[in-house]
Amino acid sequence: MNPIRKIIHIDMDCFYAAIEMRDFPELANKPIAVGGDAKRRGVIATCNYAARQFGIRSAMPTAHALKLCRELILRPVRMDVYQKESQYIRSLLTEYTDLIEPLSLDEAYLDVTESTQCQGSATWIAEEIRARIYQTRQLTASAGIAPNKSLAKIASDWHKPNGQMVIRPEDVSAFVLDLPVRKLFGVGPKMEEKLGALNIKTCADLQRYSVEYLLQKFGTMGQRLYELARGIDNRPVNPERIRKSISVEETYPKDLPNSEACLAVLPELMARLEARIQRAGKISGIHNLFVKLKFNDFQQTTIERVMDKLDLIVLRQLIQEGFARRGMPVRLLGIGIKLKQENTYQSVQLPLLDL
């Protein structure tokens, strides 16, 4: 019988912004954001909690963020600095387990099931890791401890910033009952809206539906919803996980009727993609750009082109070519990059959204 797993999700608190406040103490307690220049149509990569009180968030156009908060202090992205901090923290994590799955520069999963550190207590391991990060780097981290990855990630967000939460195996069934479905992995605003139309707001509501019904209603996502609503997630922590692509997509409440409508929403998708690439840190270089369109008859097409950089003009061309394949209203539009599968890593130069 396999032992009950002990999974920790470590999530640095507003990582880039926290580094800026540490390195420039005069910024403490002031609303700051890290991102591109508003004059060049840049986007916010991240911001501190003081800025979030004004409604500022990652992937927001910098110009809009400055309208929300005129006192906002904008800091340029110092990716080399953030990468060095991330490497230091990751080396610290390896003292506790070899089973580490980094998700980005500022978060990672750890499987400490077999760890003998801190008397084998996942709670104590998480506390010690967070304390050591603060003592050595003057940065705070939040942590979630649970029997699986999805619950650990939910828990790490529960007492942010600079806190942690434990979901014990015997508490899982009770914990998920009142959990809003929007907290589940893969449930974004559109899926939350679809579930809400069925009066599904919590996992308890979701548990009332059979897996057959959920599969019929939501396809393969239905199986995932069925399991997550019961606190089930058997995905292993995968140290060998290699990111092959970075993408964003949106399902629209009203179909996009033509290619012009698709092009009109491209700037927002581009801003989100740029922010996601920035958060990924060093990547192995861009190999392809691609566009995905799902039409209102649920048929899907993907079109890509070999490119070594993010290029707005090429993405526009791909959208037009993809739309022409069926010429029907579009319900989902996505854009992304495929990465070179090499051992040499680099920072990608982004176009700063000169739209």
Curated annotation (Swiss-Prot):
The keyword Nucleotidyltransferase applies. Its EC number is 2.7.7.7. Monomer. PROSITE patterns: UMUC (PS50173). InterPro entries: DNA/RNA_pol_sf, DNA_pol_Y-fam_lit_finger_sf, DNA_pol_Y-fam_little_finger, DNA_polymerase-Y, DNApol_IV, IMS_HHH_1, Rev_trsase/Diguanyl_cyclase, UmuC. NCBIfam families: PRK02406.1. The active site is at residue 107. Residues 7-188 form the UmuC domain. Its cofactor is Mg(2+). Binds 2 magnesium ions per subunit. One of its GO terms (biological process) is SOS response. Keywords: Cytoplasm, DNA damage, DNA repair, DNA replication, DNA-binding, DNA-directed DNA polymerase, Magnesium, Metal-binding, Mutator protein, Nucleotidyltransferase, Transferase. The record marks 16 as: Substrate discrimination. It is found in: Cytoplasm. It is an enzyme of class 2 (transferase). This is DNA polymerase IV. GO terms for cellular component: cytosol. Its main location: cytoplasm. It catalyses: DNA(n) + a 2'-deoxyribonucleoside 5'-triphosphate = DNA(n+1) + diphosphate. Belongs to the DNA polymerase type-Y family.
